């Protein structure tokens, strides 16, 4: 995997590599995500988007998108991370590469407020359409019937 990562670093000079407990994590700027993911899928065999999620770091004013990719033929796994501005979290949609990203991106939009330009139908998926806020953000406050 070392040669593979070195090749990616040559193609994407802003790519940061972090060793993980289980798999390496590639940290890439949001404007390079689509190009990196296209490379990983079309040229490196990572044909399966296992999942994506968002993590809220309010103390750092960022939301981190985390993607887990699998190469089924190559029996390999890799993690890709993107740090987003917490006030305006936005990262390109991956639905054109992996149609399964559709529902997962809608969930991240609904629960964390991340926008995905290029998504074919970005709208709430779990909360009602008139719901205010994003309930998985750490600063989200529940209101009781008494208003507290």
UniProtKB/Swiss-Prot annotation:
Transport keyword on record: yes
Cellular component terms (Gene Ontology): plasma membrane
Location of this chain's protein in the cell: Cell membrane
InterPro entries reported in the protein's UniProt record: NADH_DH_suC, NADH_quin_OxRdtase_su_C/D-like, NADH_UbQ_OxRdtase_30kDa_su, NADH_UbQ_OxRdtase_CS
Protein name: NADH-quinone oxidoreductase subunit C
Name of the gene: nuoC
Subunit structure, interactors included: NDH-1 is composed of 14 different subunits. Subunits NuoB, C, D, E, F, and G constitute the peripheral sector of the complex.
Main location: membrane
Its EC number(s): 7.1.1.-
Catalytic activity from the UniProt record: a quinone + NADH + 5 H(+)(in) = a quinol + NAD(+) + 4 H(+)(out)
Domain of life: Bacteria
GO molecular function terms listed in the Swiss-Prot or TrEMBL record: NADH dehydrogenase (ubiquinone) activity; NADH:ubiquinone reductase (non-electrogenic) activity; quinone binding
Lipid bilayer topology: Peripheral membrane protein
Pfam families reported in the protein's UniProt record: Complex1_30kDa (PF00329)
């Amino acid at each position: 995997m070392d040669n593979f990562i070195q090749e990616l670093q040559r193609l994407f000079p802003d790519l940061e590599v972090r060793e993980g407990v289980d798999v390496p994590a590639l940290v890439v700027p949001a404007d390079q995500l689509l190009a990196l993911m296209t490379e990983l899928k079309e040229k490196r065999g990572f044909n399966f988007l296992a999942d994506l999620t968002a993590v809220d770091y309010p103390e750092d004013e960022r939301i981190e998108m985390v993607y887990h990719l699998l190469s089924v033929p190559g029996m390999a796994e890799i993690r890709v991370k993107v740090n987003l501005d917490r006030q305006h979290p936005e990262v390109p949609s991956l639905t054109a590469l992996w149609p399964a990203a559709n529902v997962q991106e809608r969930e991240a939009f609904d629960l964390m407020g991340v926008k995905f330009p290029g998504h074919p139908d970005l709208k709430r998926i779990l909360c009602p359409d008139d719901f205010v806020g994003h309930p998985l953000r750490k600063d989200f406050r529940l209101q009781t019937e008494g208003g507290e």
